[in-house]
């Protein structure tokens, strides 16, 4: 079980801060990030390629694009501050880089929540080998 947890952390925690983003996802979707989004479609989880498979996967694609815009802020390792206020995620850093990364995660979590009804179990543990169509531009 411990090995499974470590693998799951490595898979979903590659961008942003695993626990912070996972907490945002849980608040907005009611789903555990590791079980539901670590390997989903072509973009949720490690890396991404091809065309997003559905609206849920497009949320992860958009997050990848957002991270690309703040790449100088080291989004894969950033630890930011945020809070939940009246059901909203509020990014609280004065540091512009940390706030930008938080906003990427915030937007993705909100998107996942707004599209939770598009979640398709057929895209859980989806093989990247199926992601061969040309990717959209960010």
From Swiss-Prot:
CDD domains: PLA2c. Its main location: secreted. Disulfide bonds join 42-131, 44-60, 59-111, 65-138, 66-104, 73-97, 91-102. Keywords: Disulfide bond, Neurotoxin, Phospholipase A2 inhibitor, Postsynaptic neurotoxin, Secreted, Signal, Toxin. InterPro entries: PLipase_A2, PLipase_A2_Asp_AS, PLipase_A2_dom, PLipase_A2_dom_sf. It comes from the Eukaryota. SUPFAM superfamilies: Phospholipase A2, PLA2. PROSITE patterns: PA2_ASP. One of its GO terms (biological process) is negative regulation of T cell proliferation. SMART domains: PA2c. Heterodimer: postsynaptic neurotoxin. PANTHER family: PHOSPHOLIPASE A2 FAMILY MEMBER, PHOSPHOLIPASE A2, MEMBRANE ASSOCIATED. Heterodimer of a weakly toxic basic protein having phospholipase A2 activity (B chain) and a non-toxic acidic protein functioning as its inhibitor but which potentiates its lethal potency and neurotoxicity (A chain). This is Acidic phospholipase A2 inhibitor vaspin A chain. It comes from Vipera aspis zinnikeri.
């Amino acid at each position: 079980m411990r090995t499974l947890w470590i693998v799951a952390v490595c898979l979903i925690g590659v961008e942003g801060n695993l626990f912070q983003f996972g907490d945002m996802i849980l608040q907005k979707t009611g789903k555990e990030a590791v079980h539901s989004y670590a390997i989903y479609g072509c973009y949720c989880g490690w890396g991404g390629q091809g065309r997003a498979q559905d609206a849920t996967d497009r949320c992860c694609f958009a997050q990848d694009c957002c991270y690309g815009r703040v790449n100088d802020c080291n989004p894969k390792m950033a630890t930011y501050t945020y809070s939940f206020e009246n059901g909203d995620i509020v990014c609280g850093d004065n540091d512009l880089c940390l706030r930008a990364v938080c906003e990427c995660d915030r937007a993705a979590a909100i998107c996942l929540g707004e599209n939770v009804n598009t979640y398709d179990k057929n895209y859980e543990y989806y093989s990247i080998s199926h992601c061969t169509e040309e990717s959209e531009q960010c």
